């Protein structure tokens, strides 16, 4: 456990020594701080100079990583050891994008051979849709693709397709359906022509309640309009491992794309779950996405900790969570194309590390994953940055931006990028009472009024942030960015001694929903309901009589 590691008390002592130091003093004394705390990898760079740390902090954090045998645990993941201990599974999302030819054997399965076989089928299918060779039941080309999934079968593909919209096939429109409330699927179907629509049903077991409910609604809509169930074969494909259930649905087994237990849902966009990405962006861009992630994998696996982006970001996060007692972490992308990135990272981070039981089954006596949240930065400035600047919470921030200007939008990117730099500087530097008072007096305010108002215009500063810069929003850079966060999450899981690759926390609510649903549908259940739940069931039934 973290608190039992030999470096932990050293970090506690060091924290007490520097907790009151203001970052602006470090910048004033060290003119090289910005260049020393800056890393470049391919087309992605990290400025971590605006963090409450110094050389001693980093030295101790790297010692902490060594205490946990982080290097050995990284290797164990890449080699296919069963590090998902509660489910006795390997964790090989990295193999999905590997350009290495050294085969990985897992329970007599040739992992890379299996992955590349599915990728080959995905490329052929994608080409047939994009080229117009694959036609609908009236011989129309496909114009709309509907991805039906939830969680990891939705968020990754949604995020990537949105981020890389500029690379999409001009004929194709992407739609994503995850919510089971009925509104989302009906709103999407309302816009579509069944004769030119392709549905991708993404569910590993082909039994996920929300996904199957939406898929059956789409199937009913399609059959009613096409007039014949046999047309399903041309318009529905599945990403699943349950061949029997897929065939019962009416989908041809040749239109089923497989993935495996060694790929967790939140790590699955690189697999057949990414079929919608490949069709929308094309195999060349999908390959570039995989390559960007692979290069980050190699960097994570081989770079020294001192220059290793995922290791640094993971350790800096631990520094705030376990020493500064930070409870929350903000993701602030300054790019419209990255608008779904915060909620993708929410799942990646919180479903992986939102746990309080160690690998040995013991209750952990320290904080683990923070609440991860965010929005597009420029909008967030006019919404909740007030709390970040002058509130009572210490909330580290990841600013994410690109250097590349948008065509035909003169002046826009300069305004956007200036705000990234200004906000990061403001969070670090702040504004003292004396500075605020001087500004007000210079504007001509009465001295007594200025003295009173100045208190409200003080920014303490010393609020930490990372600035992640991409040269441009491209397939390879998005691949690298996602892999960076995947590995950051892994690093923190190792430090906290938790299994980052199970998700038992999603199970209990699903189990309890079964008897409640029986009651709502008019059937008697033998389950026990607390008085609140029982009252609300009756309220629903009475309203809908």
UniProtKB/Swiss-Prot annotation:
The keyword Phosphoprotein belongs to this UniProt entry's keyword annotation: no
Q: Which UniProt key words apply to this protein?
A: Cytoplasm, Gluconeogenesis, Glycolysis, Isomerase
Q: Which residues form the active site?
A: 351 (proton donor), 382, 510
Statement: the UniProt record of this protein carries the keyword Zinc-finger: no
GO annotation (BP), single: glycolytic process
- Gene Ontology terms: cellular component: cytosol
InterPro entries, sorted:
G6P_Isomerase (IPR001672), G6P_Isomerase_C (IPR023096), Phosphoglucose_isomerase_CS (IPR018189), SIS_dom_sf (IPR046348), SIS_PGI_1 (IPR035476), SIS_PGI_2 (IPR035482)
Biological pathway: Carbohydrate biosynthesis; gluconeogenesis; Carbohydrate degradation; glycolysis; D-glyceraldehyde 3-phosphate and glycerone phosphate from D-glucose: step 2/4
**Molecular function terms, GO-annotated:** carbohydrate derivative binding; glucose-6-phosphate isomerase activity; monosaccharide binding
- The organism sits in which domain of life? Bacteria
Q: Give the EC number.
A: 5.3.1.9
Question: Which locations, inside or outside the cell, does it occupy?
Answer: Cytoplasm
Q: Which SUPFAM superfamilies match?
A: SIS domain
Q: Which reaction does it catalyse?
A: alpha-D-glucose 6-phosphate = beta-D-fructose 6-phosphate
Chief location of this protein within or outside the cell? cytoplasm
So what family is this one in? Belongs to the GPI family.
Q: What function does the entry list?
A: Catalyzes the reversible isomerization of glucose-6-phosphate to fructose-6-phosphate.
Tell me the protein's name: Glucose-6-phosphate isomerase
* Taxonomic source organism: Helicobacter pylori (strain ATCC 700392 / 26695)
């Amino acid at each position: 456990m973290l608190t039992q590691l030999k470096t932990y008390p050293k970090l506690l002592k060091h924290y007490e020594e520097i907790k009151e130091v203001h970052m602006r003093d470090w910048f004033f004394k060290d003119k090289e701080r910005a260049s020393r705390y800056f890393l470049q990898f391919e087309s992605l760079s990290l400025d971590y100079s605006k963090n409450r740390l110094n050389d001693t902090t980093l030295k101790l954090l790297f010692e902490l990583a060594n205490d946990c045998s982080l290097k050995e645990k990284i290797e164990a993941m890449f080699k296919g050891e069963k590090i998902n201990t509660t489910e006795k599974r390997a964790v090989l999302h990295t193999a999905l994008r590997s350009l290495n030819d050294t085969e990985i054997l897992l329970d007599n399965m040739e992992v890379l051979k299996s992955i590349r076989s599915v990728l080959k089928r995905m490329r052929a299918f994608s080409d047939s849709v994009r080229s117009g060779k694959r036609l609908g039941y009236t011989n129309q080309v496909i114009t709309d693709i509907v991805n039906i999934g939830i969680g990891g079968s939705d968020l990754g593909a949604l995020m990537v397709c949105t981020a890389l919209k500029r690379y999409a096939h001009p004929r194709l429109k992407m739609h994503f359906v995850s919510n089971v409330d009925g509104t989302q699927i009906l709103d999407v179907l309302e816009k579509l022509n069944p004769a030119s629509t392709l549905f991708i049903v993404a569910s590993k077991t082909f039994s996920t309640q929300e996904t199957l409910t939406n898929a059956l609604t789409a199937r009913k809509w399609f059959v009613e309009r096409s007039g014949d169930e046999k047309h399903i074969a041309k318009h529905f494909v599945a990403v699943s491992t349950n061949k029997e259930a897929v065939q019962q649905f009416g989908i041809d087994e040749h239109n089923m794309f497989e993935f495996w237990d060694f790929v967790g849902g939140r790590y699955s966009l690189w697999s057949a779950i990414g079929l919608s990405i490949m069709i929308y962006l094309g195999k060349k861009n999908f390959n570039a996405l995989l390559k960007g992630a692979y290069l980050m994998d190699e960097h994570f696996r081989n770079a020294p900790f001192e220059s290793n982006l995922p290791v640094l970001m993971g350790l800096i996060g631990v520094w705030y969570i376990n020493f500064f007692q930070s409870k929350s972490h903000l993701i602030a992308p300054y790019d419209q194309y990255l608008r779904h990135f915060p909620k993708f990272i929410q799942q990646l981070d919180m479903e992986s590390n939102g746990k309080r039981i160690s690998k040995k089954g013991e209750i952990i006596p320290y904080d683990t994953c923070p609440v991860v949240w965010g929005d597009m930065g420029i909008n967030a400035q006019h919404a909740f940055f007030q709390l970040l600047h002058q509130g009572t919470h210490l909330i580290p921030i990841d600013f994410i931006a690109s250097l590349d200007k948008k065509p035909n939008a003169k002046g826009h990117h300069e305004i956007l990028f200036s705000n990234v730099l200004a906000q990061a500087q403001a969070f670090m530097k702040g504004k003292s009472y004396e500075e605020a008072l001087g500004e007000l007096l210079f504007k001509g305010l009465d001295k007594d009024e200025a003295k009173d108002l100045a208190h409200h215009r003080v920014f303490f500063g010393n609020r930490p942030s990372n600035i992640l810069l991409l040269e441009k929003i491209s397939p390879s850079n998005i691949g690298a960015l996602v892999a960076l966060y995947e590995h950051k999450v892994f690093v923190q899981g190792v430090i906290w001694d938790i299994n980052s690759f199970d998700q038992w926390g999603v199970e209990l609510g699903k189990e309890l929903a079964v008897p409640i649903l029986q009651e709502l549908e008019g059937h008697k259940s033998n389950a026990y309901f607390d008085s609140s739940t029982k009252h609300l069931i009756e309220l629903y039934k009475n309203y809908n009589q």
